[in-house]
Amino acid sequence: MHMADALVAPAVAATMYVCSGGVAGFSVKKVRLESDPKKIPVMGVMGAFVFAAQMINFTIPDTGSSGHLCGGMMLTALLGPYAAFLTMIGVLLIQCLLFADGGLLALGCNIWNMAFYGCFLGYFLFWRPMMKKGMSRGKIVGASILGCVVTLQLGAFSVALETLASGITDLPFSVFVATMQPIHLVIGLVEGLITAAVLLFVYEARPEMLSCSEERAKSRFSFKKTIAILGIAALVIGGAVSLAASSNPDGLEWSMERLTGSTELENDGTGAHAAAEEIQEKTALLPDYGFKNSDSTFGTSFSGIAGSAVVLIVCVGACYAFRFFKKKKS
């Protein structure tokens, strides 16, 4: 559901940068107040895990479409909404700059659509209320599926609203919505099941790692071992499983193709669009998750491993930076 720059007018892009930036600033303040040092490695490893998982497009049968995780609901269940939102920003920023996945002009939109709803609404509407009177396997599955379905529906609807506000006449609003929502309902269901599987593993391994958990049962694995398993899983998913990803267009591309006959629209190539495109051409060392001018599968594997590592470093580094400046001010 990564939007390209051609789908967004500069005014809409600026508005969404302000909205996403405001939430990010508020989240930084909240994260600075947190004192749990174990949250830092979880941010890094789970950021890497979500990055790798987003490389895996799964086929939606009988549609010609595919989908992939957003990851906001998974992260918010582990980190809480504020750290989860900042982690998602790290993932989306690396995808945009290093891999040209999603437009730079549209980054504010993508952060809002893919991170805000999952991290904040997923937490405050589903995760926290459902875990309030105790955590169980059934509640984890229910919250995961409901949270992913609803927040992905909101994200898909926001894409349509942003194209409407941008004056993209090639994508008539009512028809675009009618195409986007059903396919993302299916994608949301699959993401909910995957999210539930990961969270159930954590629940069995280290239940206290889950947000809102008051579990005091004996843990199956140590904290370090649990983090190591998730980290290794991220590397395996990014380096190997990504090779088996579906080549079908994702939900957004599929919807566009149904309406316009193409998975992409051309921007006007001037002004803000041209500037953003020029920047991405310089920063995207591994465009489309591969080496430039090469179809080598090694490029995909390298991108998955390298991207996961960069996201881990960025998330952990940013968190330590927040804490450093907090200590300096105090």
Regions found by a protein language model. Give the residues of each.
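Interfacial loop-to-helix junctions that mark the boundaries of transmembrane helices
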Residues: 1-13, 36, 63-65, 105-110, ...
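Alpha-helical membrane segments and adjacent membrane-interface helices in multi-pass membrane proteins
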Residues: 54, 58-118
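Hydrophobic transmembrane alpha-helices
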Residues: 2-10, 20-75
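Glycine-rich ThDP/TPP pyrophosphate-binding loop and its adjacent helix/strand module
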Residues: 143-150, 158-226
